[in-house]
Amino acid sequence: MSQQHTLPVTLSPALSQELLKTVPPPVNTQQEQMKQPTPLPPPCQKVLGELPVEVPSKQEEKHMTTVKGLPEQECEQQQQEPQEQELQQQHWEQHEEHQKAENPEQQLKQEKAQRDQQLNEHLEEEKKLLDQQLNQELIKRDEQLGIKKEQLLELTEQQEGQLEHLEQQEGQLELPEQQEGQLEHLEQQEGQLKHLDQQGKQPELPEQQVAQLKHLEQQEGQLKHLEHQKGELQVPEEQVGQLKYLEQQEGQLKHLDQQEKQPELPEQQVGQLKHLEQQEGQLEHMEHQEGQLGLPEQQVGQLKQLEEQEGQPKHLEEEEGQLKHLVQQEGQLEHLVQQERQLEQQEGKVQHLEQQVEQLKHLEEQEGQLKHLEQQQGQLEVSEQQVGQPKHLEQEGKQLELPEQQEGQLKHLEKQEAQLELPEQQVGQPKHPEQQEKQLEHPEQQEGQLKHLEQQEGQLKDLEQQKGQLEQQQGQLEQPVFAPAPGQVQDIQPVLPTKGEALLPVEQQQQKQEVQWPPKHK
């Protein structure tokens, strides 16, 4: 009985192969079975503990016979189960290794797909971040541009107000017809005042004349104010610099508006840049893979294409820089054209102002001549009054009785005033260029006019001498005349001549005065 229990139990190789082929090895169940082996019944455990299991050779398998008996068969089946499981696990592992060795390309494809997914996710995140940064920069730039625009608009409004003020001053400087009439009225009143001062008969002026004097003083103040404004008519250098600065700021505003209208980059170029960034990322990824694995020839060709495409973004950046430079040059050209136009306008204004200043100077000269003529007219009126006084002395009467000559002098003076006083239309309007050309074509007429003016200057000097003589005569006439008592003889004292003149008869003096006046010009 003891020998029966010690006999080894073996299986034929055909049965073991059939079991391996028919039963597939489950992966999960193998691990569980390895962790938790199936327990054996107690009689089998004792037999296994006492006797080792021996694997017989092929020759012994032929001579061995199966022992019939229920307990032995159960023990054999229970012993075969862990062995079969170990064999199945080994076979499965070998099968997996064989599949891995046969399919390296599938593994590369799977790894490549995983890496592509990771790259796409990373690129999408970077794209979102770049979009956010671009939006923030655009918002900041728009805010800065708005602030600059507001500042420039405020400066332009202030300087426009200054320009309007200057234009108002220029309008005030152009004397209207009413102010010219006031000037003439003032000159007449000044002549009356001088005439009253010369007479000196009225020690106290009436209330009307006092009011007239105050009114004259006010008008003189207005004249001084107008002259002061005329001096300010020429625009100072500071205002000219402000005007140039204004023009530059307006050009900058237009340039900023143009920049706002033009997008930074068109959509096509933005898409190209993004595509190039993706290709660069792919290049880096391919280089990393190239270091890890030996790449086939197709991937090497792709690498070369990608390297060629790397040079394209540099070319695009150069084109973008050239476009920006061209846009800046166009803005500068427009700004220069605007500056030239504004300078031409300012030159025209300056020429117009210079013409006005020359006209004002000419008017002032004519006003001075008018004042001088009015003074002479007042002196002649005084002489007429003196002619109407009683003649106490015969010699004084002969010298003072020249009404006809004085009337001729008055008429001649009136003609001179009419010639000197330019009409208002000629003062307000410049001469027509055709008239100026005609005047230039006849230099003889201009020489005649110059000679005539020199004669008038000589006449004015003679009138001043006559004025001195008349003042002396007036002083002699104002001396009290004593009537002679009856029986007395009055000594008639002749009037002594002035220094430098000999005593001439009345007829010679009349001839001398007639010679001094030139013949009338047609």
Swiss-Prot record:
UniProt subcellular location: Cytoplasm
Post-translational modification remark: Substrate of transglutaminase. Specific glutamines or lysines are cross-linked to keratins, desmoplakin and to inter involucrin molecules.
SS bonds (residue pairs): none
KW Cytoplasm (keyword) present: yes
Organism superkingdom: Eukaryota
InterPro entries: Involucrin_CS, Involucrin_N, Involucrin_rpt
Feature: compositional bias, Low complexity: 76-91, 169-181, 375-389, 466-479
UniProt keyword annotations, A-Z: Cytoplasm, Keratinization, Repeat
Basic and acidic residues bias: start-end ranges: 92-126, 182-198, 214-231, 252-264, 274-290, 305-323, 391-401, 409-418, 431-465
Region (Disordered): 1-126, 159-329, 366-496
Broad class of where this protein is predominantly found: cytoplasm
Biological process, per Gene Ontology: keratinization; keratinocyte differentiation; peptide cross-linking; response to UV-B
Biased composition (Polar residues): 1-15
Tissue expression: Keratinocytes of epidermis and other stratified squamous epithelia.
GO cellular component terms listed in the entry, alphabetical order: cornified envelope; cytoplasm
UniProt family annotation: Belongs to the involucrin family.
Assembly and interaction partners: Directly or indirectly cross-linked to cornifelin (CNFN).
Known function: Part of the insoluble cornified cell envelope (CE) of stratified squamous epithelia.
Protein name: Involucrin
Organism name: Hylobates lar
